[in-house]
From Swiss-Prot:
Keywords from the UniProt entry: Heme, Iron, Membrane, Metal-binding, Monooxygenase, Oxidoreductase, Transmembrane, Transmembrane helix
Protein location: Membrane
GO MF assignments: heme binding; iron ion binding; oxidoreductase activity, acting on paired donors, with incorporation or reduction of molecular oxygen, reduced flavin or flavoprotein as one donor, and incorporation of one atom of oxygen
Source organism phylogeny: Eukaryota, Amoebozoa, Evosea, Eumycetozoa, Dictyostelia
Organism: Dictyostelium discoideum
Gene: cyp515B1
Residues annotated as signal peptide: none
Requisite cofactors: heme
Name of the protein in its database record: Probable cytochrome P450 515B1
Entry's EC annotation: 1.14.-.-
Residues that span the membrane, as ranges: 1-21
Matches recorded under Pfam families: p450 (PF00067)
GO cellular component, one term: cytoplasm
């Protein structure tokens, strides 16, 4: 028995060595020792994967390798190699790794989890639909929804307290923008007034992100017989019960001569496409991507911005003064669609607010909403950063490390918006780069500008305990969120 055990240990050690040695000779990136079945996943601390990968980056450099279970994986950790891969060599890294959980969520018909040819078609249709609907709806929609949020917060200040956990309200604000943009509908801010099916969808979307971040059987194949995707399927079914009837109703009642929202334009584009690559059934999966991704990324960025500017009140005051300087401060904002347009900045005036734009960039750099990019598949042998990436390798962009790299950013853990006002601002890859850059990038940036300038002109945010800074260490799900904190909200005079 002991002899057999020694033979097994020797064979495993020999396989690991041969695997490592052959790849080293072929210019394969360095990395930690991979164990049978699990590869290098033992190096990743649950809930702190971004920090674990950052430690490996510090040890092995800007391009390193490890196995995710049975998948050969290369991690890209600095902006230059991420750009080199996804922008300069985009054709080699256009495809996705199609993990089992991705198929459960998107049925190979959504935006994020599809292969190149399907994705190109869906991206083209989305771009046309986004452009047509955006032109007609965007700024008015932002203003209308912000003022609903504004009145709710003011009501809370009068009737309850000037301290609050603001995260759920920011999520409602962000959700309402995407929901209204898609369906021309909104939801209330009070839990007790939200229809039960919508509230269940919101809860299910939060559960989805948690479950997707804890799916080891995606990579460790021996676990698949024991860890079914039952929970994930249940969550997706709950979300489908909310989305599908609304999409079906839009299809049934569509007025081709008077499209009113993004879904209307999307239906028209799909029907007019001669290739019929994208089916009407795909709309529910596209909507799921936009609702879940669009809600969490924007609300998380706003919450981080409140946290950082509460820890750096002098910057918040300078930001307030910049907004006041460029807008009319002799009038009071109203809460109707015909609000006083001179009181708040317009989207076309973005360039007049360099400090605000720098605060947004610094917030997204310091705490990127999605710290790890969705996995790509290398479709042909390609050299990146001086290393050979073999065909079939999984590629992951470590956006967290690339955004907090001391080679690119001086004092990267310090919140310093001024770094983006300098003559040669550093390069960022918050939304990744290349053809498969986040499709909601421009919409998210417009939301952050429109909401943020109004928010920080109307309210002052501060810490209830002046002697204690907010913790700037993040919690990782699929998105990077701050630890829950209570903020003090004061109405600006």
């Amino acid at each position: 028995m002991a002899t057999l055990l020694l033979v097994i240990i020797f064979m495993i050690t020999f396989i690991i060595y041969k695997n490592f040695d052959s790849k080293r000779k072929n210019k394969y990136p360095p990395g930690p020792i991979n164990l049978p079945f699990i590869g290098g996943l033992y190096k990743l601390k649950p809930g702190k994967q971004h920090l674990s990968l950052n430690e490996l980056y510090q040890k092995y450099g800007k391009v390193f390798s490890m196995k995710f279970g049975s998948y050969d994986t290369v991690i890209l950790n600095e902006p230059d190699v991420i750009v080199e891969a996804f922008h300069l060599n985009s054709t080699s890294f256009m495809d996705r790794i199609l993990l089992p959980s991705f198929e459960v969520v998107g049925k190979n018909q959504n935006i994020g989890f599809t292969q190149t040819e399907y994705w190109k078609k869906i991206r083209g249709i989305l771009n046309i639909s986004l452009t047509k609907s955006k032109t007609r709806l965007l700024e008015g929609l932002f203003n209308q929804e912000y003022f609903r949020f504004d009145q709710f917060i003011k009501k809370q200040l009068k009737s309850k307290s000037d301290t609050m956990f603001i995260r759920p309200y920011l999520k409602r604000l962000s959700f309402n923008i995407i929901y209204s943009y898609l369906f021309s509908e909104t939801i209330p801010y009070e839990d007790e007034l939200i229809p039960s099916d919508i509230l269940d969808f919101i809860h299910a979307s939060e559960e989805l992100l948690v479950v997707l971040s804890r799916m080891p059987s995606d990579y460790i194949k021996v676990l698949r017989p024991f860890e079914s995707h039952k929970k994930l399927k249940e969550i997706c079914d709950r979300m489908s019960k909310f989305i599908k009837p609304r999409v079906d109703k839009k299809v049934e009642l569509l007025d081709q001569d008077n499209p009113k929202c993004f879904i209307d334009y999307l239906i028209l584009q799909i029907r007019s496409d001669p290739s019929q690559t994208i089916k009407i059934d795909a709309i529910q999966y596209i909507v799921l991507d936009l609702l879940v991704g669009g809600t969490d990324s924007t609300s998380s960025a706003l919450e981080w911005m409140i946290l950082f500017l509460s820890n750096h009140e002098s910057i918040q005051e300078k930001l307030y003064n910049e907004i006041c300087k460029n807008t009319n401060t002799n009038t009071t904002a109203t809460t109707t669609e015909n609000d006083n347009e001179s009181y708040f900045p317009k989207l076309i005036e973005k360039n007049n607010y360099p400090l605000f734009n720098a605060c947004v960039k610094e917030t997204l750099r310091r705490s990127p909403p999605v710290p790890l990019g969705l996995p790509h598949l290398c479709s042909e042998d390609t050299e990146i950063g001086g290393y050979l990436i073999p065909k079939g390798t999984q590629i992951i962009s470590n956006i967290y490390s690339a955004s907090n790299c001391d080679k690119v950013f001086t004092d990267p853990l310090e919140f310093n918006p001024l770094r983006f006002i300098e003559n040669s601002p550093p390069q960022t890859v918050t939304f990744s780069t290349g053809p498969r850059v986040c499709p909601g990038k421009n919409l998210s940036e417009d939301e952050l500008f429109s909401f943020g300038t109004k928010l920080f002109k109307t309210f002052k945010f501060s810490r209830p305990n002046k002697n204690q800074l907010y913790d700037e260490v993040a919690i990782l799900g699929i998105t990077l969120e701050p630890k829950p904190f209570i903020t003090k909200v004061s109405l600006r005079s």
